[in-house]
Curated annotation (Swiss-Prot):
SMART domains: S_TKc. Belongs to the protein kinase superfamily. CMGC Ser/Thr protein kinase family. MAP kinase subfamily. It comes from Arabidopsis thaliana (Mouse-ear cress). The gene is MPK16. Signal peptide: none annotated. This is Mitogen-activated protein kinase 16. The keyword ATP-binding applies. Pfam families: Pkinase.
């Protein structure tokens, strides 16, 4: 039976939203599970969109974890931008003072940049340019709000098949104010070492600075170019060795700014190293791209460009118009007053409840007027979802992916945890032994054919969603991989792309589907991929027919490894 897409009256929609939101979302299946709780895909009957509902269990067991959740949902409410993942809704808890779980509705993204890099060995210079452009544009917006992400890495960059990227995971982000101390102790700073700026190596003390995020973006861009991490250090010493092997020994002044004493002594005693020319490290790469990358990877933080300066670089000539790109209003101190004092479990519970009210205007008005009851007089959607989540989670643990009885008749729902570009491929089932727990995000082990090597230490992730297949005469890709240019190739070339991109920049869109347009330049496969990519690379590059139109679909992962991701 087809869903009813008839437009409801405004009165009906308001009532449906406030008092019937349990019927708004049709739960479909479990798409991720971790120590935090469970994530289910769902269908939003209001908008007709696929969404992901994340249930976070026992969030107040540890105040630090609850504070991180509060920080993220608050920042994602304040930072509304096409290059930042969007929270669409937060379900109102059944009780203001006693709730333990929360349900957050995110937009559903198909993959992340980590999977894109693994699955595509024939990304073009246009992909590199457009990916970096989006990252810097989103980062400019974040930094103009005086927010610093602090944990940028490929797995925290979500991706869709139209080459749209979105920054996510703001749990470690911080807001800087004018009276912020010169040195901050990052008690929860556990960001991945590989993307950590050198001034942070071995030290949890650092001043809030945009240069930390710029370094991370540089590492991500370098990984796009080579297909493997640039500085995969095993420990702090190894990390410094890898950095200096490529960038050369830093100056005495730069070493003096490293806060960790042991790291300073190690760098001072290190033999003098000459920097490796970036053209040798990244052969066949646009010199303009390398010049910008070299700036972003400067050892000295003061030598790195800001996101706005990077967008103005000649590398983006004809693509970016910095003056048209949106900036954010600085976040006010009042929003993050809780960061400046010690808060209790009851404090953070009230603050999270207050955040959820932002998505319920009528209840928010009652709350602000002081007329809102502690216990609600209508059934909460949370109670409605608890049963469905429990049913799905039970079958998920048992190695099946059945839908609830009332949903099993719908044959068009997303299937198990592997995404195939070949619709005739049998659907793989997932056993409980394959579930990776204890991750901070939705995590499902991705599977490879037997004999294919994998990095056992790499957390496996991402969930299923239907990726649009190539159309209009697109070249046939190898099984499991959908390929295409950054945007439809046409005779208009780059001019069309700039015009389309300007239109996207001038408006805030919830699900942008347009990227830049320009002719595709053929790029040979990367030959220096890591072992984990050998099985994919062995199949050979996909061949694209010349002068053919194709839509942008570089995101889909290789056969048996593709996962989509919630958010």
């Amino acid at each position: 039976m087809q869903p009813d897409h008839r437009k409801k009256s405004s009165v009906e929609v308001d009532f449906f939203t406030e008092y019937g939101e349990g019927s708004r979302y049709r739960i479909e299946e479990v798409i991720g599970k971790g120590s935090y709780g469970v994530v289910c895909s769902a269908y939003d009957t209001h908008t007709g969109e696929k969404v992901a509902i994340k249930k976070i269990n026992d969030i107040f067991e540890h105040v630090s974890d609850a504070t991180r959740i509060l920080r993220e949902i608050k920042l994602l409410r304040l930072l509304r931008h096409p290059d930042i993942v969007e929270i669409k809704h937060i379900l109102l808890p059944p009780s203001r003072r006693e709730f333990r779980d929360i349900y957050v509705v995110f937009e559903l993204m198909e993959s992340d940049l980590h999977q894109v890099i693994k699955a595509n060995d024939d990304l073009t210079p246009e992909h590199y340019q457009f990916f970096l452009y989006q990252l810097l544009r989103g980062l400019k917006y974040i930094h103009t709000a005086n927010v610093f992400h602090r944990d940028l890495k490929p797995k925290n960059i979500l991706a869709n098949a139209d080459c749209k990227l979105k920054i996510c995971d703001f749990g470690l982000a911080r807001v800087a104010f004018n009276d912020t101390p010169t040195a901050i102790f990052w008690t929860d700073y556990v960001a991945t070492r590989w993307y950590r700026a050198p001034e942070l190596c071995g030290s949890f003390f650092s001043k809030y600075t945009p240069a930390i995020d710029i370094w991370s973006i540089g590492c991500i861009f370098a990984e796009l170019l080579t297909g493997k991490p640039l500085f995969p250090g095993k420990n702090v010493v190894h990390q410094l060795d890898l950095m200096t092997d490529m960038l050369g020994t830093p100056s005495a002044e730069a070493i003096g700014r490293v806060r960790n004493e042991k790291a300073r002594r190690y760098l001072s005693s290190m033999r003098k190293k000459k920097p490796i020319p970036f053209s040798h490290k990244f052969p066949h790469t646009d010199p303009l791209a390398l010049r910008l990358l070299e700036k972003m990877l400067s050892f000295e933080p003061k030598d790195r460009p800001t996101a706005e300066e990077a967008l103005a670089d000649v590398y983006f000539k004809g693509l970016a118009k910095v003056e048209r790109e949106p900036s954010a209003q600085p976040v006010t101190k009042l929003e993050f007053e809780f960061e400046r004092r010690r808060i209790t479990k009851e404090d953070v519970r009230e603050l999270i409840y207050r955040e959820s009210l932002e998505y319920h205007p009528k209840m928010l008005k009652e709350y602000l007027d002081g007329s809102e009851p502690t216990n609600f007089m209508y059934p909460s959607a949370v109670e409605h979802f608890k049963k469905q989540f429990a049913y799905l989670e039970e079958h998920y643990k048992n190695g099946t992916s059945h839908n609830p009885p009332e949903r099993q008749q719908h044959a068009s729902l997303p299937r198990a945890c592997v995404l195939y570009s070949d619709n005739n491929h049998p659907v793989a089932q997932q056993s409980s032994a394959e579930v990776t727990d204890g991750l901070s995000k939705c995590s499902i082990r991705d599977e490879r054919p037997r004999g294919a090597d994998r990095n056992a230490q790499m957390p496996m992730s991402r969930i299923p969603i239907n990726v649009p297949q190539t159309i209009q005469g697109a070249a046939v890709a190898r099984p499991g991989k959908v390929v295409g240019s950054v945007l439809r190739y046409n005779n208009c070339g780059a001019a069309t792309g700039v015009e389309a991109l300007e239109q996207q920049q001038r408006r805030m869109v919830r699900n942008p589907a347009a990227a830049s347009q320009y002719p595709k330049r053929t790029q040979p496969c990367k030959s220096n991929r890591g072992d984990e990519d050998c099985a994919t690379a062995a199949e050979g590059p996909s061949r694209l027919k010349p002068n053919t139109q194709y839509i942008p679909q570089k995101v889909s992962a290789a056969q048996d490894t593709a996962m989509s991701r919630w958010y």
